[in-house]
């Protein structure tokens, strides 16, 4: 199933957003609505009294078939703050370890009354398969599918950019560095940035870690990190997705850090007010140094806190 078909599966017969499966194909208006709702959540703070009953009495399930820290727990917190009952699915302790399919798992939980499924899976096609079998009134949210899509990460990164640089992206110079080929975060970010009218998007990484499927069309692409830094407003550092890549694509971690690691010296070559983002988990000393990750230009922890607010916005938009 292609991405266009998956995009269309997100909408009901009236054209309203029913699921969140990918940012590709979402309108600027829809993206801005979700970001505006998330910004309102930020203004309310970590204890939004007025929203405690938005999902009261509703059961949602975090259905994760891959490890997660930030995404899983921020979705859990988001659903709790909206008053939902949250089930945390552990694949290793479930009947999937006995051969049950993801679709059968979802349908059984749906039969028990779960109305919202937040799903992470290593295979891209599974998200589409689940969307095809859920019943009317049940919502599916993609929390990361293989190396193709991670829509809520894309949204929280856009919110963080708005906070750091304002709502007009047209003059921004953004630089993505690292393993773009295997990064679902990069893909979702690039789709969102194009829809929101980003200025110049630069992409840098080893040739073996750059995609050749048209994703980088319109981007400035180079293998020379140092040459790409001048005037950059935003640096998005991406980890090596070693669980998804073939052996030998990178000679060594030391070699990678020497060529693509963000150090304080390299950051000094970007714009003076440049900000650093990283979706996590961070591999310190590989793609980024401690000094930069913990420094004043790092917005990495803001990304983590924004994750809760964005995921609240998605849940209340689809289920509220």
From Swiss-Prot:
Residues binding carbamoyl phosphate: 70-71, 120, 150, 153, 280-281
EC number(s) given by UniProt: 2.1.3.2
UniProt pathway annotation: Pyrimidine metabolism; UMP biosynthesis via de novo pathway; (S)-dihydroorotate from bicarbonate: step 2/3
PROSITE patterns linked to this entry: CARBAMOYLTRANSFERASE (PS00097)
Substrates-to-products reaction catalysed: carbamoyl phosphate + L-aspartate = N-carbamoyl-L-aspartate + phosphate + H(+)
Superkingdom to which the source organism belongs: Bacteria
Function text: Catalyzes the condensation of carbamoyl phosphate and aspartate to form carbamoyl aspartate and inorganic phosphate, the committed step in the de novo pyrimidine nucleotide biosynthesis pathway.
Protein name: Aspartate carbamoyltransferase catalytic subunit
Claim: DNA damage is one of the keywords in the record: no
Keywords recorded for this protein, A-Z: Pyrimidine biosynthesis, Transferase
Subunit relationships: Heterododecamer (2C3:3R2) of six catalytic PyrB chains organized as two trimers (C3), and six regulatory PyrI chains organized as three dimers (R2).
Family named by the database record: Belongs to the aspartate/ornithine carbamoyltransferase superfamily. ATCase family.
InterPro entries xrefs: Asp/Orn_carbamoyltranf_P-bd, Asp/Orn_carbamoylTrfase, Asp/Orn_carbamoylTrfase_sf, Asp_carbamoyltransf, Asp_carbamoyltransf_Asp/Orn-bd
Organism: Xylella fastidiosa (strain Temecula1 / ATCC 700964)
Pfam families xrefs: OTCace, OTCace_N
GO terms, molecular function: amino acid binding; aspartate carbamoyltransferase activity
Keyword Transferase attached: yes
Biological processes per GO annotation: 'de novo' pyrimidine nucleobase biosynthetic process; 'de novo' UMP biosynthetic process; amino acid metabolic process
Sites where the protein binds L-aspartate: 98, 184, 239
A GO cellular-component term linked to this record: cytosol
């Amino acid at each position: 199933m292609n991405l266009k078909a998956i995009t269309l599966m997100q909408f009901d017969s009236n054209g309203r957003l029913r699921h969140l499966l990918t940012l590709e194909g979402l309108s600027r208006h829809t993206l801005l609505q979700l970001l505006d709702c998330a910004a309102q959540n930020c203004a309310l703070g970590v204890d939004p009294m007025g929203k405690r009953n938005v999902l009261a009495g509703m059961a949602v399930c975090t259905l994760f078939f891959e490890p997660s820290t930030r995404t899983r727990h921020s979705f859990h917190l988001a659903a709790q703050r909206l008053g939902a009952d949250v089930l945390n699915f552990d694949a290793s302790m479930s009947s999937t370890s006995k051969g049950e399919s993801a679709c059968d798992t979802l349908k059984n939980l749906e039969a028990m009354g779960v109305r919202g499924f937040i799903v992470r899976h290593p295979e891209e096609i599974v998200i589409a398969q689940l969307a095809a079998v859920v019943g009317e009134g049940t919502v599916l949210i993609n929390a990361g599918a293989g190396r193709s899509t991670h829509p809520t990460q894309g949204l929280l990164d856009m919110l963080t950019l708005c906070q750091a640089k304002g709502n007009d992206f047209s003059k921004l110079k953004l630089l993505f560095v690292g393993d773009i080929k295997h990064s679902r975060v990069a893909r979702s970010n690039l789709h969102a940035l194009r829809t929101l009218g980003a200025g110049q998007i630069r992409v840098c990484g080893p040739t073996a870690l750059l995609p050749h499927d048209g994703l980088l069309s319109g981007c400035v692409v180079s293998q020379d990190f140092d040459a790409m830094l001048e005037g950059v407003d935003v640096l998005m550092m991406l980890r090596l997705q070693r669980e998804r890549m073939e052996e030998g694509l990178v000679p060594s971690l030391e070699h990678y850090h020497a060529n693509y690691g963000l150090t304080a010296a390299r950051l000094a070559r970007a714009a003076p007010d440049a900000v650093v983002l990283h979706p996590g988990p961070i591999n310190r000393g590989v793609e980024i140094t401690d000094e930069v990750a913990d420094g004043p230009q790092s917005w990495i922890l803001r990304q983590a806190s924004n994750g809760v607010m964005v995921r609240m916005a998605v849940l209340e938009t689809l289920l509220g």
